[in-house]
């Protein structure tokens, strides 16, 4: 991946760190001069990805979450990575309302939210080894 700037952040899979993570990524994205709406989209998608790591990847146990962000031209690509339990069936997990946690509020909407607010979404996962969620947002009108 070619890029003109990048950052990497590691933090514990604690819910208190979710707002910290989205704020760091939003600050990094600010160099692209996004609109308030574009920043809100990025923050929402990062929040969903980090929350998925905490709840599903690590099942509320402590592990490390890594966020990498890359800027190239007018786009930002964000990778949210965990070394948790992984996803058995990515296609099924990405279906709206699919959840393994029926008791959770907004269950089954994480990937749908990420797809809605970002321009591209890719998920790579190996059961027992972890998951990488890669999201791309084009800032401005040229995609």
Swiss-Prot record:
PANTHER family: ANTI-SIGMA-F FACTOR RSBW, ANTI-SIGMA-F FACTOR RSBW-RELATED. It catalyses: L-seryl-[protein] + ATP = O-phospho-L-seryl-[protein] + ADP + H(+); L-threonyl-[protein] + ATP = O-phospho-L-threonyl-[protein] + ADP + H(+). Keywords: ATP-binding, Kinase, Nucleotide-binding, Serine/threonine-protein kinase, Sporulation, Transferase. It holds the Pfam family HATPase_c_2. Binds to sigma F and blocks its ability to form an RNA polymerase holoenzyme (E-sigma F). Phosphorylates SpoIIAA on a serine residue. This phosphorylation may enable SpoIIAA to act as an anti-anti-sigma factor that counteracts SpoIIAB and thus releases sigma F from inhibition. The gene is spoIIAB. This is Anti-sigma F factor. The keyword Nucleotide-binding applies. One of its GO terms (biological process) is asexual sporulation. SUPFAM superfamilies: ATPase domain of HSP90 chaperone/DNA topoisomerase II/histidine kinase (SSF55874). It is an enzyme of class 2 (transferase). Belongs to the anti-sigma-factor family. GO terms for molecular function: ATP binding; protein serine kinase activity; protein serine/threonine kinase activity; sigma factor antagonist activity. Its EC number is 2.7.11.1. It comes from Thermoanaerobacter pseudethanolicus (strain ATCC 33223 / 39E) (Clostridium thermohydrosulfuricum).
